[in-house]
Amino acid sequence: MMKLKENKVMTIDLDGPNGNAFYLLGTAQQLAKQSGMDDVMITEEMQSGDYMNLIKTMDKYFPFVVFETNNPEYMEAFHA
């Protein structure tokens, strides 16, 4: 089971092993279930496009997740 830090923030390094799509989908599914959200709908939306869509969708539903990256293209996804 995943737990959030005391300040209710989870950090994911998109440049590391936890930045892969399978990890992000699994994390989103667990967070959605813990929050009483529709995990199937969220993960289907995450999978409906490319990797950029996946991280944008995760950011949309889980604003308490902080994504770290050195990739400027990924950073643009969060500022668009």
Report the location of each language-model feature:
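Long, contiguous binding/interaction regions
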Residues: 1-80
